[in-house]
């Protein structure tokens, strides 16, 4: 389950970072 969790995290991380950067600006 750890492998699939990392895959999901890798997919979600860029979206979360993108939203965070948009809110910063």
Curated annotation (Swiss-Prot):
Cell compartments where the protein resides: Secreted; Target cell membrane
Pfam families linked: Antimicrobial_4
GO molecular function: toxin activity
A biological process from GO: defense response to fungus
One Gene Ontology term, aspect cellular component: extracellular region
Tissues expressing the protein: Expressed by the venom gland.
Domain of life: Eukaryota
Keywords, sorted A to Z: Antibiotic, Antimicrobial, Cytolysis, Fungicide, Hemolysis, Membrane, Secreted, Target cell membrane, Target membrane, Toxin
Family: Belongs to the non-disulfide-bridged peptide (NDBP) superfamily. Medium-length antimicrobial peptide (group 3) family. Ponericin-W subfamily.
Function comment: Has a broad spectrum of activity against both Gram-positive and Gram-negative bacteria and S.cerevisiae. Has insecticidal and hemolytic activities. May act by disrupting the integrity of the bacterial cell membrane.
This protein's name: U1-poneritoxin-Ng1b
Organism: Neoponera goeldii (Ponerine ant)
UniProt lineage: Eukaryota, Metazoa, Ecdysozoa, Arthropoda, Hexapoda
């Amino acid at each position: 389950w750890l492998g699939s969790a990392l895959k999901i995290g890798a997919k979600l991380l860029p979206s979360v970072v993108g939203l965070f950067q948009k809110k910063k600006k």
